Curated annotation (Swiss-Prot):
InterPro entries: 7TM_GPCR_serpentine_rcpt_Sre. It comes from the Eukaryota. Belongs to the nematode receptor-like protein sre family. The chain crosses the membrane at residues 28-48, 61-81, 121-141, 165-185, 192-212, 253-273, 283-303. The lineage of its organism: Eukaryota, Metazoa, Ecdysozoa, Nematoda, Chromadorea. GO terms for biological process: sensory perception of chemical stimulus. The gene is sre-31. GO terms for cellular component: membrane. It is found in: Membrane. Pfam families: Sre. Its main location: membrane. It comes from Caenorhabditis elegans. This is Serpentine receptor class epsilon-31.
Length: 357
C-alpha cells in the first residue's frame, strides 16, 4: 500500500493490504485469521520452551536464534493494527478503499491524503512489519556470523561464554534493520534497493555455510584420525559436533525459508500485475504470517530430543495415555514376576518337605 501526503508531497510505503469486501465477510476472515494466529503462537511458544529447556547449542547461538523466533509477535501486532483498520474499529478519517499491490506508481492505486492524521497507528503497524522482515534477514546473517566465529575460535569457544559476541551482533542487526525500515517506509529507495538485503542474504549465507561445513568436516576427520598429532580437548570435540549439528538443522530451515520466500514473492508479483484476483491477497498475506508452523515444526522434528519433548508438550494426552500403558505393563510384569517367585518358593519348600519324608 502506497500513501501520498499531498500536503508535503511525501510517500509512505506500507506492507499492508485492504480489500473491497462486505463488513460481514471481513469479520469472518478476521476471526479465521485470529484463530490461525493463536495456533501459530501456540506452536511457537512450545518450540521456544523446548529449545530453552533442552539447550543443545552454545548459549551465544541460543541468544541469537530465540529472538528470531519470538519476533513473530511483533509482526502479529502490526497485523492486528491492520485488522482494526479493516474492520473500522479505528477510524482513519478517510476511505481507504482497495489496495492489493505491494508497489505501484499508478496514481489510481495510491491513497492520497491531506495529512497523516488518523493514520498514525496504521503507519506504526506497517513500521512493525517492515522492522520484523529486516530483523529476520539481518538476524540470519548474525547467526551465520556467530557460527563462523565459533569455527574460528574452536580452541576455547565452547568453554568460554563471550556474551559480548551475540550482544554486539544484535546491536548491529537492529541498527541495520531500523535504518532499512525508515528509508523503505518513507519510500526513499527504489524497490530493487529495498530487496538488496534479501539478494545478498543468499550468496553470503551460502558462502558461510560452505566455510563452516568444510572447516568442521576437516576438524572432524582430524579428530577421528588415530594417527593425528594434534590434541583436541573434549570441549573442542563437542564444539565441532555442535557446529555440524547446527549446519544440518540450518540447512533444513534455510530450505523451508527459501521455499516460503519464493512462494510469497510469486504471490506478490501476481497481485502487483493483476495476474490473480485481489481477494487472493488474503492467501498470499497470511501465508507469510503462518511461517512459524513449518519453520518451528522443521526445527522440532529435526532433532530427536527436541522432537520427543515437543510431542510430550504438544500432545500431552497422548503422552499421558502412553505413560499409563507403560506403567500398566510394568505392573503386570512385576505381578507376574512376584507370582513366579512365589510359585518357585512354594515348589522349593514342597520338595524340601518331601525329601524329609
Amino acid at each position: 500500500m502506497i500513501i501520498k501526503n499531498t500536503g508535503t508531497s511525501t510517500f509512505i510505503w506500507l506492507p499492508v493490504y485492504f480489500y473491497n469486501e462486505p463488513l460481514n465477510l471481513k469479520l469472518v476472515i478476521s476471526i479465521f485469521e485470529l484463530l490461525s494466529y493463536i495456533l501459530c503462537g501456540y506452536i511457537l511458544n512450545l518450540s521456544i520452551y523446548v529449545m530453552s529447556k533442552i539447550q543443545l547449542f552454545h548459549k551465544n547461538l541460543m541468544f541469537l536464534t530465540v529472538p528470531l523466533f519470538a519476533i513473530w509477535y511483533e509482526l502479529i501486532i502490526g497485523k492486528f493494527i491492520t485488522i482494526a483498520y479493516r474492520l473500522k474499529i479505528v477510524n482513519p478519517g478517510v476511505e481507504l478503499g482497495e489496495h492489493t499491490v505491494f508497489w505501484t506508481n499508478d496514481p489510481d492505486k495510491i491513497l492520497e491524503v491531506g495529512g497523516s492524521s488518523g493514520l498514525e497507528l496504521l503507519i506504526f503497524g506497517g513500521f512493525l512489519q517492515w522492522h520484523t522482515i529486516y530483523s529476520i534477514v539481518f538476524g540470519i546473517l548474525a547467526v551465520a556470523t556467530e557460527r563462523t566465529i565459533a569455527s574460528v575460535y574452536i580452541k576455547d569457544y565452547e568453554s568460554k561464554k563471550r556474551i559480548w559476541i551475540p550482544i554486539f551482533l544484535i546491536i548491529i542487526c537492529q541498527v541495520l534493520a531500523i535504518f532499512m525500515t525508515f528509508i523503505v517506509i518513507n519510500r526513499k529507495v527504489h524497490p530493487i534497493i529495498a530487496r538488496l538485503p534479501f539478494i545478498f542474504l543468499c550468496p553470503i549465507s551460502f558462502a558461510v555455510w560452505l566455510f563452516v561445513k568444510n572447516k568442521n568436516k576437516t576438524l572432524q576427520k582430524e579428530i577421528q584420525n588415530p594417527k593425528r598429532t594434534r590434541i583436541f580437548t573434549l570441549s573442542q570435540q563437542c564444539q565441532v559436533k555442535e557446529n555440524l549439528r547446527a549446519l544440518r538443522l540450518g540447512t533444513r530451515l534455510v530450505a523451508v525459508v527459501l521455499v516460503y520466500i519464493m512462494v510469497c514473492f510469486l504471490g506478490i508479483v501476481s497481485l502487483t500485475f493483476d495476474l490473480i484476483p485481489g481477494v487472493c491477497g488474503h492467501f498470499v498475506e497470511n501465508f507469510l504470517f503462518f511461517h512459524p508452523i513449518p519453520i518451528c515444526l522443521t526445527a522440532m522434528f529435526s532433532i530427536p530430543r527436541w522432537k520427543t519433548e515437543f510431542e510430550k508438550s504438544y500432545l500431552p494426552w497422548k503422552y499421558r495415555r502412553n505413560l499409563r500403558k507403560i506403567r500398566q505393563m510394568s505392573m503386570e510384569i512385576e505381578e507376574d514376576s512376584i507370582k513366579k517367585i512365589s510359585l518357585e518358593t512354594d515348589l522349593y519348600f514342597k520338595q524340601l518337605a518331601e525329601s524329609w519324608i
